Amino acid sequence: MSKPMNKGVSRSGKPGKISYVSRKVGALIEEMVRQADIVPGEDMIVHDSSMWVDWADRGILAIGESYMERKWDSPHVDQVMAKLAAMPSEKKRKLFRSWKTRLLLSIAILFNQQRRAKELEVVEKHYDLGNEFFRSWLDKNMQYSCGCWKGVATLDEAQFAKMRMIGEKLKLKPGMTVLDIGCGWGGLGRFLIKEYGAKVTGINISKEQIRWCRNTAIAEGLQDSFHSLNQSYRDLEGKWDRIVAVGMIEHVVPKNYQEFFDICKRCLANDGLMFLQTIGANISKEVLNDRWLTRYIFPGGALPSIAQIAKAAEKKLIMEDFQNLGPDYDKTLMAWHSNFTKVKDDLQMSDLFIRMWEFYLLYCASGFRERKSQLWQFVFTKRSKECYDFE
């Protein structure tokens, strides 16, 4: 699993002896990994054993960064991360129960040479990667959200099924107006126009994505039915028969949830329906409690809990329907990773970025697999006097 632990590599790159404390703490963390049923030399190959102390100090941030820096490898990163996530807390507590162990851990963390004052320099940033990057590994409709895998086998089919499910849950009829908040590259909007005869307004704060929406709508002859705007949801005016927001509220911090639902209520017709799809957290928090994801993938992001969504919608909208598709996001992320693996050598991205993106997709897949993360779909109305029925 790892190289002999009597030698290490300092931050400067010069070889040197690892201290007694670091060796002891490193051995403890390695034992914790073994107790998570991670097979030495098979599930995980360690190239630099100095990372163990950093794992003890900075947790997931160090785990992700050490993978990015090639300090460890695995043929199945998703399985390694899933096993670590599934490890019972009691097992971890037993390893660190004695006062001597806790003292050694404290000393090792105090003198951790792997600590950084700032993030690794990944030149390519998540939302500045360009349309062609995402086009190379997403489905043909460029859906950057969870697909629906019931009865289907491919990513294209899963994303088509997801869009069909949204259309059915919205109970769309020809001529209805739809507001798509955070419309991405417009794939859902174009689908609702072609399949249901809807009139769609899509908003997005990304200029590049809006340009893509407009050009694609023109290319498909849908420009009269698809109106795309480069603006924030805060600037919305008007009313729509239906509102849809897929993978958008994750970028609205909890303190602004109330405002978001106030705006949705104002923009929704009295007899309208609103569909919301979001990644969800099991516990209410004000910020995304994951230092690696916050630093490298979703700065400023947050995952709402059911309680936070319900509280924000209270006295504004009525929750009519709820569904959890969490396990389907595991399948979606693994399909994305499979596609990404096929094209990564042609992307002309840095090695640090490639490994960051691989870890992002596989780490997130493990979270859904172990049910640490959820994928929720909500349907809301203003004041419908009929029972909502979806089959």
State what each model feature region is.
Residues E220-Y233:
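Conserved SAM-binding strand-loop segment of SAM-dependent methyltransferases
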Residues M1-F160, M165:
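Feature captures hydrophobic
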Residues W185-Y196:
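Conserved SAM-binding loop of SAM-dependent methyltransferases across substrates and taxa
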Residues R234-I243:
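A short acidic, Gly/Pro-enriched loop at the edge of an enzyme's catalytic core
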Residues Q258-N270:
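A short glycine-rich, Lys/Arg-flanked "PGG" loop and its adjoining helix->strand segment in the class I
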Residues I279-E391:
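Substrate-binding/catalytic lobe of Class I Rossmann-like enzymes that use SAM or dcSAM, i.e.
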Residues D271-I279:
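Conserved beta-strand signature within the Rossmann-like core of class I S-adenosyl-L-methionine
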Residues G175-G182:
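Conserved class I S-adenosyl-L-methionine
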